[in-house]
């Protein structure tokens, strides 16, 4: 499950492989991370409020269907569902590391590979 249409907040894919790529895509990583937070928080609240089991099941089902964060060919956290990142793109925005901060979806303790990919993204972006 992904958002569509979607667009990375700051820019589109760049580089030789993406000259014909559209900036409108399906499932930007930041979108999916925000949706994960919203659904996770709703599930947590539904437990506290003792909402129906079927409602909680529907939230869990949506969480399980979300596209996962992915590590790309340059060992970076992918900004898009497709591996369109360019390691030479020194663009100042890093929306796709929302899962690291301000969210807490990426941690060296719970997801060390994603944490390293987020770190690589920060290093590649300069």
Each model region followed by its residue ranges:
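Acidic/histidine-rich catalytic neighborhood
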Residues: 1-45
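Active-site core of glycosidic bond-cleaving carbohydrate-active enzymes
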Residues: 28-126
């Amino acid at each position: 499950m992904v958002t569509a249409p979607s667009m990375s907040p700051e820019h589109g894919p760049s580089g030789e492989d993406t000259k014909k790529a559209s900036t409108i895509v399906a499932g930007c990583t930041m979108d999916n991370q925000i949706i994960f937070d919203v659904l996770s928080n709703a599930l947590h609240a539904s437990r506290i409020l003792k909402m129906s089991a079927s409602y909680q099941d529907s939230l869990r089902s949506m969480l399980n269907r979300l596209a996962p964060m992915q590590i790309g060919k340059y060992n970076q956290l992918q900004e898009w569902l497709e591996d369109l990142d360019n390691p030479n793109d020194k663009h100042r925005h890093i929306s796709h590391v929302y899962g690291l901060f301000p969210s807490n979806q990426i941690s060296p303790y719970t997801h060390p590979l994603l944490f390293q990919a987020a770190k690589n993204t920060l290093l590649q972006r300069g």
